[in-house]
Amino acid sequence: MFANEVIGFINDSPTPFHAVSNIKKILDDNGFVEVYEGGREEIRFGEKYYVTRNGSAIIAFVMPEGIPSSMSIVASHCDSPCFKLKPEPVICVEKNYLLLDTEKYGGLINSTWLDRPLSLAGRVFMDYGNKIVPKLVDFKDVRLVIPNLAIHMNPEINKGYQYNLQKELLPLLGMGNDRDSFDKLLKSACGAGKILGMDMFLYNSEPGTVAGIDNELILSPRLDDLECVYASVDALINSDNKDKLCMCCVFDNEEVGSKSLQGADSDFLLMTVKKIAAGLNMDEQTFSGMLSRSMVVSADNAHALHPGYTEKADTNNRPVINEGIVIKKNSSLKYTTDGFSEAFFKKICKNAGIPVQMFANRSDIAGGSTLGNISISHMSVHTVDICLLYTSPSPRDRG
């Protein structure tokens, strides 16, 4: 079942670094060849390639058998809301409790992170002589927890409570007062060498699962947006298009605005397309013509109609889980879909026998944005924002 494939990928991808590493393995197993930014590798017709940036963003593409007439691009993101460790993270409380100093990453529902098993994963940079070497770590067998206060000490909690990020949402690492315990934990995974830097995140260590009376739902961490990531990679691998340049883009840092080296608000996509064009000796007219006939599908998630909060959905544009793929529109261009890209995508879905639903926010609720309108600010291409459905950005999404 495809849902179990998605869940397996998500379980193995606790951070963007792990997600990109796993994508590389999938692509390698399916005949893709890695090329490098700034490299002079030959780009050949009919071949399959990928390029990464900073270990947390990746673009894979399948070359047509001749000069491409257009591009079909799917863009998604591999980061999710969570907590990130600060430098020098160990805090000792009353000489008995070891906490980790964290800050929130992205838009969290804070209370959903309490009283559940959490783990640590990320990327560590090691000093190996004249080289700085990155190493992925995942302490999946180490359990941390952000403990709630007993209701007897906070009897008003069920009437609404605002948690203090600096004081009440720090994970408990363990008991005692050994401030070096965290460094020892890192070194146990990294081996010899001095640790120079790190990007470490808390994640929900409970594995994803299917749910519902007919297994029609997925309960999993990081559904936003790893389900779209996996689906787009799988679609690219199984593409048999001979005329278009087919491309899958996975960006990082969407949850915090995409303004990074590896985010959608960077030149990663544009520079990759230019690298391909240069490898094919495209002139400017051919290149601009290819762009004008291309389409970007921004594949992120949207809010399904919530059975407990039906009033939070738009009057008419209120999609339901498992009733078809969703096209998102917004007059303020938080989503990039316009009439043309809507019609174009609906035609594709009709030809494939796929039902379509429309999503729009209530007029009095701003809603979120996604990466489509950001990525096309660097490369002007028709874009449609589509999505699968989920119900909340929490450590255990539903979709």
List each language-model region with its residue ranges:
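Active-site-adjacent substrate-binding region
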Residues: T15, S181-I195, A302-L389
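A generic, well-ordered mixed alpha/beta core segment in the N-terminal half of proteins
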Residues: S70-P155
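Soluble metallo-hydrolase cores and metallopeptidase-like ectodomains found primarily
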Residues: A19, N54-A60, E65-P68, V137-S220, ...
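N-terminal capping segment at the start of a domain
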Residues: M1-F17
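Acidic/His- and Gly-rich active-site-bordering loop/insert found
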Residues: E34, G39-L85
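A glycine-rich helix N-cap at a beta->alpha junction
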Residues: L269-G289
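Conserved small/polar residues in nucleotide/adenosyl-binding loops
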Residues: Y390-G399
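Alpha-helical metal-binding/catalytic segments enriched in His/Glu/Asp
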Residues: L219-G257
